[in-house]
Swiss-Prot record:
Subunit structure: The basal body constitutes a major portion of the flagellar organelle and consists of four rings (L,P,S, and M) mounted on a central rod.
Name of the protein this chain belongs to: Flagellar P-ring protein 2
Keywords: Bacterial flagellum, Periplasm, Signal
Signal peptide range: 1-20
């Protein structure tokens, strides 16, 4: 019987009751973030694995027209070495013109593979429609595909998505509010009122009283110098301050697909008794032949004979006293050889009965 593995996500695993963390590890500066860029382009040079869709042909003709090449009226180029693609990139904060970023290229048509292709010059735009980077280069595709003359086909990984390392050049800097105003705001990665207040107290102990204040469960506002050069040194000192974040809320995370169960250390059980068993129903159909006596005038017929067998496992009962943890429950379930699915069913029943002090989240 597969045993249940319980992961206790608890700071009690460390040597101290509360583990100090740097501000930069639990919070980020408001406004200092990456920005997503996207563009539409063409990949050329494919070994017959491209496409001949109408929008690809239209894009191909428009590209030729930009180079002064006009196709004769009514001409439809039959191209199999070109594919229409979407190009995406993430522009890090404070990126400057001339710096390079990685891009991801993915087919949006019926191309079979992008392996061996080259992305032609593609403008990457932000949410405001402005061009912030230009991408171009040879694709690296980890997937592959092969097709035989009889229609047999082999595909490995995903051959219609490729990467270009440092494939886009930044052309424009995105404005950043970092140097404006009298305050810098830190946003916690995990919202918590206690953590926000402890962080503000740590900053005040370092800078002086009333220099920082917790705005809500997420944001901590710190008074900062207006000079940008001083602000960088100021922020460097602040983000390396250490303090003790609050313990997380009592949660149980259950992955129903893998059977993984993660339990926080503050989860407790109220007094409860649980019994859990299983029933198996097996139906077997037998066909019997009914043969009448000679000269009786009867007919030989086939008569179905159903055999139904029901087996029910003995339900094991667990009784818990006040203050016990989920670790005690898992240990008890493991002792009787139950499966992870049994523990999931027990957890759901306990939560519905109000016997679990914490959140039960099933993913």
């Amino acid at each position: 019987m597969k045993r249940i593995v319980l992961l206790l996500m608890s700071v009690a695993l460390f040597s101290t009751a509360a583990q100090a963390a740097r501000i930069k590890d639990v919070a980020q500066v408001a406004g200092v973030r990456s920005n997503q860029l996207v563009g539409y382009g063409l990949v050329s040079g494919l070994p017959g694995t491209g496409e001949a869709n109408p929008f690809t042909e239209q894009s191909f003709a428009a590209m030729l027209q930009n180079f002064g090449i006009q196709l004769p009226p009514g001409t439809k180029p039959k191209i199999k070495n070109v594919a229409a693609v979407m190009v995406t990139a993430e522009l890090p904060p404070f990126s400057k013109p001339g710096q390079q970023v990685d891009v991801t290229v993915s087919s949006i048509g019926s191309a079979k593979s992008l392996r061996g292709g080259t992305l032609l010059q593609t403008f990457l735009k932000g949410l405001d429609g402005q061009v912030y980077a230009v991408a171009q280069g040879n694709l690296v595709v980890s997937g592959f595909s092969a097709e035989g003359a009889d229609g047999s086909k082999i595909v490995g990984n995903n051959p219609t998505v490729g990467l270009i390392s440092s494939g886009a050049t930044v052309e424009r800097e995105i404005p950043n509010p970092f140097g404006r105003g009298d305050y810098i705001t830190f946003n916690l990665l995990e919202s918590d009122f206690t953590t926000a207040q402890r962080m503000a107290d740590a900053v005040n102990n370092f800078l002086g009283p009333q220099m920082a204040s917790a705005v809500d469960a997420t944001s901590v506002r710190v008074r900062a110098p207006r000079d940008v050069s001083q602000r960088v040194a100021f922020l460097s000192a602040i983000e390396n301050l250490e303090f003790d974040p609050a313990d997380g809320a009592a949660k149980i995370i259950v992955n129903s697909r893998t059977g993984t169960i993660v339990v926080g250390k503050h989860v407790r059980l109220k007094p409860a008794a649980v019994t859990h068993g299983g029933m198996t129903v097996a139906i077997k159909e037998n066909l019997n032949v009914s043969q009448p006596n000679s000269f009786s005038g009867g007919q030989t017929v086939v008569v179905p004979d159903s055999d139904i067998e029901v087996t029910e496992e003995k339900g094991k009962m667990f009784k818990f006293e006040p203050g016990l943890t989920l670790d005690d429950l898992v240990r008890a379930v493991n002792e009787v050889g139950a499966a992870p699915s049994d523990l999931m069913a027990i957890l759901q029943a306990l939560k519905q009965a109000g016997a679990i002090e914490g959140q039960l989240i099933i993913i």
